[in-house]
Regions:
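Glycine-rich phosphate-binding loops at beta-strand->alpha-helix junctions
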Residues: 47, 210-211
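Phosphate-handling substructures
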Residues: 61-183
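Generic beta-sheet signal
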Residues: 3, 200-206
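Low-complexity, flexible helical/coil segments
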Residues: 38-44, 76-80, 100-106, 238-244
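Active-site metal-binding loops of divalent metal-dependent hydrolases
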Residues: 9, 208-209, 258-260
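Acidic, low-complexity terminal tails and accessory targeting/binding regions
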Residues: 76-93, 174, 182-200, 213-287
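Active-site-proximal alpha-helix that buttresses catalytic centers in soluble enzyme cores
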Residues: 1-75, 82-97, 162, 166
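Conserved glycosyltransferase catalytic-site signature
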Residues: 50, 208, 234
């Protein structure tokens, strides 16, 4: 089995759509798509992913199924009362409500009490800090809390517990495994049992965080190792395949991570999205 993970094009997060650059990237991806031998396609319900997929699907004459759990993996983190986490997330926003809705929630999945934590009390006052995504941790904090990079111990870290990350992680990876089982590969603890060996290709048009979570599950590493160590550019393609070295037992291996051949072929600059400054003194890049 072959899996392709495609990140959406350069995003306008406020309106959940593509920027003009993102539209060019999506067109470049579509023009190159026949070289990827794309098979059965699935996509996130978020507008930026659906818009990206639409270029490819139209070019190839294909359709895609929308899967709600393919939306971005963005359980919120509430650091109010845990101000020591400002060391990890010094860029957390003040609580103006701007991150409580839209692409920062998981409809039908986010626990209502989580959102209530950021709402006003009986006096109309809310907590000082708003929600923050659970990655983009400062390197110095990560160095002091290496449990975040452990394949098992990340689950008991302060950040994981505060953000209910194991709950969301298990939900999403569980849905993913259900889909793989429908296509012949059933997860059993660490391995996949091959119930119907095949060389089918499944394509997922989705998001950076969600891709990191799913790939960490396939490669048996902490999600934080992927979230902190990888910046898959908009419209990049990552390829993983099964290896059945023992009859009936499959594991996954990454062949390509963040491939942007289509952008380079078209002369389109690769977006800086998801990256931070290459040098601290570069004020033009995100800190």
């Amino acid at each position: 089995m072959r899996l392709l993970f495609v990140r959406h094009g350069d995003p306008d997060y406020v309106h959940d759509c593509l920027t003009e650059k993102g539209k060019r990237e999506a067109q470049d991806l579509a023009d190159y798509a026949d070289k990827w031998n794309m098979g059965t396609c699935f996509m996130s319900p978020c507008g930026r992913a659906q818009e990206t997929a639409s270029y490819v699907l139209k070019k190839l004459g294909k359709t895609a199924e929308t899967l709600p759990w393919l939306m971005e993996f963005v359980t919120c983190l509430n650091i109010n009362g845990h101000e020591e986490l400002l060391e990890a997330f010094p860029d957390v926003r003040l609580n103006d409500g701007s991150m409580i809705a839209g692409p920062y929630t998981l409809p039908g999945l986010l626990k209502p009490e989580k959102l209530k934590e950021f709402g006003p009390d009986e006096n109309g006052n809310g907590p000082k800090y708003g929600p923050h995504i659970v990655w983009d941790i400062m390197p110095s904090y990560l160095a002091k809390h290496r449990e975040l990079l452990d394949p098992e111990d990340w689950r008991t870290s302060e950040i994981a517990k505060l953000g209910d990350i194991p709950y969301y992680y298990d939900y999403v990876t569980g849905k993913f495994d259900e889909l793989l089982a429908e296509h012949g590969y059933r997860r059993d603890d660490f391995l996949y049992h091959v119930e119907s060996a095949n060389e089918e290709t499944l394509v997922f048009f989705c998001h950076l965080g969600l891709m990191c979570v799913l790939m960490s599950h396939l490669l048996h590493v902490s999600p934080f190792a992927m979230l902190q160590g990888c910046a898959f550019a908009p419209t990049s393609v990552s390829e993983l395949v099964t290896e059945e070295r023992e009859k009936g037992i499959a594991s996954f291996r990454a062949l390509k991570l963040g491939d942007v051949s289509h952008l380079r072929a078209a002369g389109e600059p690769v977006s800086f999205s998801a990256r931070f400054c290459e040098t601290y003194d570069n004020e033009e890049q995100r800190h």
